[in-house]
From Swiss-Prot:
Alphabetized PROSITE patterns for the sequence: RIBOSOMAL_S2_1, RIBOSOMAL_S2_2
Residue spans of biased composition, Low complexity class: 289-301
Name of the protein in question: Small ribosomal subunit protein uS2
Phylogenetic placement of the source organism: Bacteria, Pseudomonadati, Acidobacteriota, Terriglobia, Terriglobales
NCBIfam families per UniProt: rpsB_bact (TIGR01011)
Organism: Koribacter versatilis (strain Ellin345)
UniProt KW Ribosomal protein keyword: yes
An annotated GO BP: translation
Any one GO CC term of the record: cytosolic small ribosomal subunit
Length: 301
């Protein structure tokens, strides 16, 4: 599993939630307190729950299964695409097409059309067509490319979703839940954690926070995939797997975007005083006069 530290979380601003007026009462257990009208996320819980999520995605990849990275908000688009490619998985970073999972057969027809247009653009067939027709086909190709490029080689439903902002990607989350596909998600203070299988409480808006989580999850996937490859080789060529000594890892050349396995996250041996870390001005829960009323109303629904 990929390791993550309290220092990394703090430097990335993972502890900053939304304004106190924009919150979901179901996130109460993950909130440490409030400062200047902003909820502060309990990073002790973020560390613990990230470790669980990291282990899960690593195990999924180790079984040769597929992870789909999802993040269509502007600040998440680049990180989602880069990290998914780096660990050899798939992504959606522009727009989630309704029915992408639940209407998989139809989506695959669109993917097939994209591949056909890509071939036409490279094999010389465009040169045989009228200019207006080429412009029309190119417009169609670019539209499909924008929405489906990250799943062009995904030949079956994914086995797990990694999501940035479960509110923004609620359609993807609902489709996954309907099909029984586990969801790992970065969940901010305005989200509903009950819709997610593996909750990672944290800031889902800050670019540094998004990049941190996406890169660490990609590391875990890469490590799991490496174990899957190693297991396949051992079962095929070695009679006694216990005698096999690992010789190499997936590349460590960051310049070329290759994933590097990391050590398993060590358990937190001592409690970190959040008040000391965050300084003065943090009020613990409840932080608003209407909070208990809101929470009670939410529980009755």
């Amino acid at each position: 599993m990929a390791n993550i530290t309290m220092k990394e979380l703090l430097e990335a601003g993972v502890h900053f939630g939304h304004q106190t007026k924009r919150w979901n009462p179901k996130m109460k257990e993950y909130i440490f307190g409030e400062r200047n009208g902003i909820y502060i996320i309990d990073l002790q819980k973020t560390l613990k729950m990230f470790k669980e999520a990291s282990k899960f995605v690593s195990d999924v990849a180790a079984e040769g299964k597929l992870v789909l990275f999802v993040g269509t908000k502007r600040q998440a688009q680049d990180a989602i695409a880069e990290e998914a490619k780096r660990c050899g998985m798939f992504y959606i970073n522009q727009r989630w097409l309704g029915g992408l999972l639940t209407n998989w057969v139809t989506v695959q027809k669109s993917v097939k059309r994209l591949k056909e247009l890509d071939e036409m653009a490279t094999d010389g067939r465009y040169e045989l067509l009228p200019k207006k027709e080429v412009i029309k086909l190119e417009r169609e190709r670019k539209h499909l490319q924008a929405n489906l490029a990250g799943i062009k080689n995904l030949n079956r439903l994914p086995d797990c979703l990694f999501v940035i902002d479960s509110n923004k990607e609620q359609i993807a989350v609902k489709e996954a839940r309907k099909l029984g596909i586990p969801v790992v998600a970065v969940v901010d203070t305005n989200c509903d954690p009950s819709e997610v299988d593996y909750v990672i409480p944290g800031n889902d808006d800050a670019l540094r926070a998004i990049r941190l989580f996406a890169s660490k999850i990609a590391d875990s996937v890469a490590e799991g995939s490496q174990l899957a490859d190693k297991s396949m080789i051992e079962s095929t060529n070695v009679s006694n797997a216990a005698e096999v000594i690992p010789q190499s890892y997936i590349g460590d050349d960051e310049e070329h975007g290759l994933a590097q396995p990391t050590e398993e996250a060590a358990p937190v041996e001592e409690e970190i005083n959040m008040e000391e870390v965050l300084g003065k001005g943090v009020r613990k829960q409840p932080v608003s006069e209407n909070e208990n009323v809101e929470a009670a109303a939410a529980e009755q629904k």
